[in-house]
Each structure stands twice: as C-alpha cells, then as structure tokens.
C-alpha cells in the first residue's frame, strides 16, 4: 500500500506547549472575526436597510466568503510545506483588508444611492445589486477568514487518530474567541470606543495572530523540505506517515479505501443538514427568547454568547472524551438526534407553559444542551470525513463549506419561509424533526449496528484504516468497535432499528405538531393575551411577531415582538396636527413607523399627501383592529404605505416633504431604533424637507435625564430652530426642528385643531378629555416647554448620538456609574427648565 511522501508535510511536530500558543492565537482570531461581523453588518445595514431581505443578503455574502475560503484553505493546506506560516500571512491579509474596509463602505453607500432610484421598482434586480455589492465589500476578507481553520488543522494533525481531537481543540478555541468578542464588543468596547475604533482593536488581534504565527513558523517550520529522521513521541515525527520527503520526491497520495467515500458523502450531507438546522434555530431561538424583553443589544449579545459557549464546550468535551472506537456514523447520528429532541423541548419555554422564568435562566436552559451537542458533532464529523492525516486540512475545508452552505439556506429559510408559515415555535418543532430524521438515517446506516446480538464483528473501517497506516500513535490506543464501540451497546441490528424507529417517530410527532394550533406552538405573548378573554389576533412575518388586542378603546394595543408599541392615544394624532399648526401651508407629510396608523390617518384627515414607511409588512394590515374606518385610509388616493426601512428610505428617496414625523419603535434603547436618533439620520431627514418644513422626533418618557439631553443635543446640532412640546397624553416629548423659526400662534391652532373634522378625530381617544377649539388653544400653550436659546442652555455641551457612537443603544457602563439617576417625566422636565 502506498504511503504519502508529500513534500507538503510540515517539518515539525506541534508539541503541547507550542499547540497551546497556536490555540491562543486562534482564540484572538475568533474574537476579531466576531467583532468584524457585528461592525460590518451594522455598516451594511446602514447602506442597504434593516429589512429582512437586506439583512439576509448581508449574512449570505458574509458566509459565502467563509465557505469558499474554507474550500480554498483546504486545498492549500494539502500542498503547503509550511501551513503555519501561510496561516500567519492570511491573518495579516485579513488585518489589512479590515483596516481599509470602513473607507470602502462610504463608497459603497454612494454607489448604492446612485443605483437605487432606477431599481426601486424592480425588486429582483435590486436584491441582486445588493448581494453583489455586499459580496464585493466583505467576501474578500471573509474568504481569508474561512481559510484559517483548514490551515491550522493541517498543521496540528499528525496522525489520523488525533484528527478529531485536534479539530475539537481548534473549533473550541475559535468559538471561545468568538464568544469573547461577542461579550467584549457588546458589553464593553463599542460603548467605550465606538464602532470604528472597536474594529481597529480587532485588527490588532489579527496582527497579533499573524505575527505570532510567523514567529512560530520561523522557529518550528524552518526545516521544511529538508531530510529529517523520524523520531519518537516527544515532540518529533514517528513513522513513515510523518516523514518528510527529500527534495525532488514525487508526492504519492495515500489510497482511499472503498468504504470511505460513501461514509464521507453521508457525513457531508449530515453536516449540510446540521448547518441548515443550526442557523435556522439560532434565528428562531433569538426571536423566541427575546420576545417581550425590548430587544436591547444586551439581550441579543447574551443569546449569542450562550450559543457560542455551548458550541465551544461541546468541542472541548469531544476533545476530552472522544475515542477512536466511538468515532462512528452512529455517534454522529445520536448527536444530531439529540439536538433535534432538545430543540423541540425548547418550545415549552417559548410558549410560556412553565410560567415566568428569568431571561438568563431560560436562555441557558434552552440553548446550552443543544449547542453542546452541536459543538461535539462538528469535530466528530471532521474525523469521520478525514481519510488520512495528510488530508485533514482538505477534509475540514470541505466539511466547513458544507456546513456554511446549509447555514446560508437556514438563515433564508427561517426568515422567509418558516416563521411566516408555521410561526416561531412551530418552525422549531419542524427543524427538530428534520434533525431527528437525519440522525436516525445515520444511526441505522452505521455498519456497527448490523452485527448480530452477542457477536463481535471486525470493523471494516478500522481494519482498512489499519492496513493503510503501518504505524499508529502509541499515545492513542486502538480498539475493535465490534466489542467496545457503538455496535456493542447497541445490541445488533434489531435494537438499532428500534432506536432508529423511535427517532423517526419523534420526528414525525414534531412535524405533525408544528402545523397545529396548540398552546405549545403559540408564542408566550399570544398565550398570555388569549387568557385575558379580549379579542386577540396573532401573526408572524419575516421580521417579528405581531399581536393586537381589540375590544374597548382604552384597552386596544399593538405588540411587536411581545413589546407594546402603542395604544390609542391623542399623542400619535397630534404628531400630524401640531406639525401642521407650525406650517399651515404644508401639503406633504412623511410618517416613519406606522404603528396603529393614527398619525398616518390624521395626515390624511388634514388633506395632506401622506406617505407612511413601516418595517413590518404585517403591522399596517392590523389598522382595522384600532380604527373601524381603516379601509378608507389604507386605500386613500392621497395615502401610500411603504414597507421598507425608514432610515434607508429617507437616505435614498428623492421625494421632499413639508412635514416629517418619526415615531421609532419603543423602547428607545432597542436594537434598531437608535438609527432613527443619530446625527447622520437627522441630517438625512433634514435633506428631505422643503424650505421651512418641520421635522418631528418623538422621545418617550422614562429615559435618564442625561440620556435625554444627549438626544436633544443631537437634534439641536442639526436643526437651526428647535421647539420641545410636552405631550398632552403624558407619554413623552415632541421635538420639532426646522430651518425657520417655530412658533405656535392662536390662529393656526384654531385653523388646524379647531375645525369640526379635527375635533372629531382628536376627541376620539381614551386618554384625553373632549376639548373644543378654545380648549386646544390652551392645551398647546401649556404644553410648550423650551425652544432655541433656553433649550440650548438646558442641554449644555456634551456628547451626541452618532452612527459610530450609538450611545442610546450601548449604555450599560454609563448608567452603572451615573450620578443623576433621575428619569424624565412631565414633572421632572418642568422642574429642570432653566429660569
């Protein structure tokens, strides 16, 4: 049997201490990669918008680079004499690209802005352009990132028996680094340094990994290509499989036994399915666990960190407990089936059937068991797909590419197909069933399960592998899986079929339940609302869950993601009426965030051409729950509802307006809402105004006073004239800005708020008493708070909210050490007004 004498074989063995240093470098690389993912995704969202289609495009471009990079890295790993040196060069190249990429985003934004008007009516072509631009921006860097795992696998793997263990170490190290990057970036770095500087700190990590690898390579790979005698276990090569060839030797590939190819195809297929299910579950678990929390960045960071921790822990457990005898298709099948069962069990938490469970507890309980098995399965699959030590890098590259391909489809499937058809919990049941089926197939297909009960059959996999490997690592004992592997405890073919049938039965049960209307397939919010006895509607789209509560006017509510968005209130109607009172000659009105539709409806009542931009496609269709005459306004000739990202629309659209009203989704700290409060957005919004137009931004109460001043300071830094009005419904503050003076006069108030149609509209609310024209004149007079010079005296100097420093979203440490813990309300603002 031919033995490989490839000149690509690394010349030195990675000793335990050297291996520890290499793993530490890979931890740094993993941390940098996660920071890049956060920062670059945010930059691209600002370019393309926060719609599900745009986000899916970004994720696809990012992961496509990783997948193709892993394939290329696997090929290079099989031909490189110095894979550690090549790894170091790749890390330095990532650092160089990451340094330049922030500048490229600006050019990308300008290019997309120029293309958008001609493509906005052709969504298919627009999606293609988005994907092409996102791919051009991030794929070169992510391509290089994808190369790193195969290269280091090639460097560390010296014998076939240790392939899984080394891959487990590497996968655990990189995933642990990603978890560290998640926690440091989400909880510390972005708040302290901003997005741009945080990305440069990640560049420093790549530089450390790259330079460290090059230094190690000079010391330990310097002899590559020279003749070296095989040596023993203590840090040197042993056996002909590890001996480097002399100069000029013709590389001979080790023969791959016939039984191996079908097994590798099965492993690759299972890895593809696992990638699909895992990424889809991550999307759906995030939606399920974040429901009702307000969706702050700290919630998402915690979910992702626990997800990554479980994967890293699973890989470490594989490294600690795996044995060659247990590295079977059946073991991989058990892992996949276990993930399926545990995933299906999480819907009990997601439906609220166990009562109130603190967020961190339910996140750990839901994610940790399944993700540990995910982390265990990947290095196991890598070992099963590797025919020889020389092929380890290529096998891992192929495996990672298959996993990434499944992940891309999983992210699309979860958002665009599953959530909208089966709902969050139903989709989780379906995905769990899919993993169970995949696990059952692998379990039954394992040759070890086809031995007769009580008999021991020689393992064909091990026997063929031993024939190809004249030497083995004395540190890793071999065993006959017919007596010590899965075949022994499985008890033969009959029991194998029984276990496989049980897996399939659980899968079918989950698949059937996923399409039924059961308490376990409903979200926690829907179950809670149904118990009130009020009329409730529930829907899910690619963005979020949408629940409405009908009945008496005072109790009507709209909830998105389990969080109350708004209720029937005079404040939403006044957003249009007060803007019109400031500019009585206004003809056009732009509303950002549809909500119940109250502001949009009032704009049409005022006779304005009204455009409303809403991110969720489901929310506008719920307007009839709150307004009996909703159909008239939804189909009004002067009205237009645009399902899009409000920030993106303001930046790209060429229309101009006399009035703009922005009412971001609460809470004000939620991830995604901050982009409607930054200086850059306000500047773009100002550009959509005609001369003399008014821009209204809503600030809810229950915000720390210092944070409130930051918002006002940012707003006042963009608009030359600013006036703040305390809402009559006592829910928050209207901030009005313009390039012209802003003054309410009695005549315009009577004209806009005092006519019969306006009075009917404004008085049809449960949170404000019926008022006549004189009463509204007095209400507006009392509600005015600060303007221009007095306002600037109140806010003083200090930081503003920007895209790079999203201070309203990242606030943890600032609030932890905040001296003034006063939260704004009507009374606190009246006390704080300068005399």
Task: Label each PLM-derived region with a short phrase.
Residues 743-835:
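SAM/dcSAM-binding transferase cores
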Residues 2-455, 461-746, 750-751, 805, ...:
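Alpha-helical transmembrane segments of multi-pass membrane proteins
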